Regions:
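Non-transmembrane catalytic domains and loops of membrane-associated enzymes and transporters
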Residues: 2, 85-397
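N-proximal low-complexity "stem/linker" segments adjacent to membrane-targeting elements
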Residues: 3-113
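Short helical patches
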Residues: 4-8, 317-321, 405, 488-491
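Loop-to-transmembrane boundary segments
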Residues: 15-26, 397-416
């Protein structure tokens, strides 16, 4: 019997929540289903048709996302673990070289904690590459100090800023690993994160990328904004990405912590780093979604056919990057991805990649602590969302039908939301339709409470779930307008 055929009893009996909480989940699904039926009746006979139709489809989407993420989602790490352990016996596991890449600019307050989490990783066969993207604060000095403490660190200082994407591209040319890890410089990973990701990759040759589970650092003791963002990020990972993982089609491998199989990402690295959009060279936004879209769009019949061409283009990147200094094992000793690595790639099967999320892979995320910085972040994210319409939206129909249906429905509702909110806040009061207004506000509160209760079920004892309804109201009545501003100012490249 092979390792793949082995099954561990503890993995098959793994439960995210106990039976009592599962019963509450079923009640939640039932409640959403009842609300969906009520909204259909209200749509046909009582409320404003436009608002009622929009509200009906939001509940339809909510029910499907919850149902699939509850019933169908299985953490890929639980399956991967079962491949290497059976009846208390641990089997051998391949330990490929992993390249951890951290691009950083002006993060003197976070970079030490971030890099230290990489050093503390329990996975031994790793290399750590930090690219200082022209920082003007003390980031460079901190990195040099850490280099003295940990000689194995590979640090590149760029004389001027080239942006996150090109910084990662430069690091990828140095990286020798079979697996790339990308982590934002204001985040810190759990010590076992890499170990778990490697097991997932080893469990399924067709997995091309993995996204981790983020939680806001310091949320329990932070201000209300941190608490609201924490419950939101938690749900966007476990519920939304959990649903997408059920179809092996996660739409965004977050910059906070993601893992990529080298052969899945390298063919697109150069095109991603030099993304063009609306006539703009090196489009600054949509870093995470755009890279994910490249991998999602790989055709099964020709998945890696262009890898040689893409790697050849990427191999010239360091000639265009303003390198100020680098440390031992840096640029001069790198192994070009256009060499033997490409030959090995061409001998492998060509297929479409699976992209999954693992709840077991943890990362602490740094988020804005003030409202103005939060709004600026959300504007950037909406510019990324607009770009993703042409990237992910253009290829997602190739993925499983129902996943594509829910994806296109979700983005349609997101674009329509400002118009619905405008009608609810302005036009319906003028026409005296108070019933529709009241029911719409009730629907927003209901959705927020559903997500809040879900958070509480998975985090018993935590009071943060109370902040989810507040965040839902903010996303509905504040964030909705940002998509319009983001579209108008999409050519404005200012990051802050």
């Amino acid at each position: 019997m092979t390792i793949v055929q082995e099954t561990i009893k503890s993995s098959t009996t793994y439960k995210e929540v106990d039976q009592k909480r599962w019963f509450v989940r079923y009640l939640m699904l039932g409640a959403v289903g009842i609300i969906l039926a009520i909204k259909l009746y209200l749509l046909l006979f009582i409320v404003d048709f436009t608002v009622g139709l929009y509200s009906f489809f939001t509940s339809f989407l909510l029910f499907n996302i919850l149902f699939i993420s509850y019933i169908k989602f299985k953490d890929p790490y639980i399956y991967a673990k079962s491949m290497y352990v059976s009846n208390g016996i641990t089997y051998g596991i391949s330990k490929p070289l992993v390249s951890i890449i951290v691009p950083v600019k002006n993060e003197e307050g976070n970079i030490r904690n971030c890099v230290q989490s990489c050093i503390n990783s329990t996975y031994s066969n790793k290399e750590i590459i930090v690219v200082n993207d022209g920082s003007t604060d003390d980031t460079a000095a901190i990195l040099d100090e850490m280099k003295k403490e940990e000689p194995s660190l590979n640090i590149i200082h760029l004389s001027e800023s080239v942006g996150k994407k090109q910084a990662i591209e430069a690091a990828s040319e140095i990286a020798k690993g079979e697996i790339f890890v990308s982590m934002d410089s204001d985040c810190d990973m759990a010590c076992d994160a890499v170990e778990k990701a490697v097991k997932i990759f080893n469990s399924d040759r067709k997995i091309g990328a993995i996204s981790g589970h983020g939680r806001v650092r310091g949320a329990t003791t932070g201000n209300a904004l941190l608490k609201m963002q924490d419950v939101y990020i938690d749900a966007s990972c476990r519920i939304l990405k959990g649903m997408e993982t059920s179809f092996c089609s996660v739409t965004c491998c977050a910059g906070s912590l993601s893992f990529f199989r080298r052969e899945a990402v390298m063919p697109y690295m150069h095109d991603w780093a030099h993304d063009k959009f609306l006539g703009m060279e090196n489009f600054k936004f949509a870093t995470d979604r755009r890279l994910t879209a490249f991998i999602l769009g790989t055709k099964e019949s020709s998945g890696l056919e262009d890898s040689s061409k893409s790697d050849d283009s990427a191999s010239n990147i360091m000639h265009n990057i303003p390198v100020l200094a680098h440390c031992k094992n840096g640029l001069d000793t790198r192994t070009s991805s256009s060499g033997s690595d490409t030959k090995n790639t061409n001998n492998k099967l060509r297929y479409a990649w699976k992209i999954v999320y693992s709840q077991s892979i943890k990362v602490n995320v740094g988020v804005p602590e003030t409202f103005p910085t939060l709004i600026r972040q959300q504007i950037r994210w909406r510019k990324s969302f607009i770009r993703s319409l042409f990237a992910t939206g253009g290829i997602y129909w190739r993925r499983p039908f129902y996943a594509a249906l829910l994806y296109y429905l979700q983005i349609s509702l997101k674009f329509l939301r400002p118009l619905i909110v405008l009608k609810v806040l302005i036009f319906l009061p003028l026409s005296g339709d108070l019933i529709t207004i009241l029911l719409y506000f009730s629907g927003v509160l209901f959705a927020g409470m559903i997500y809040g209760v879900d958070f509480r079920l998975r985090n018993p004892g935590s009071s943060l779930w109370l902040y989810r309804p507040l965040f839902t109201f903010m996303t509905t009545f504040v964030y909705s307008w940002l998509i319009i501003y983001a579209a108008i100012t999409i050519k404005k490249t200012a990051w802050r």
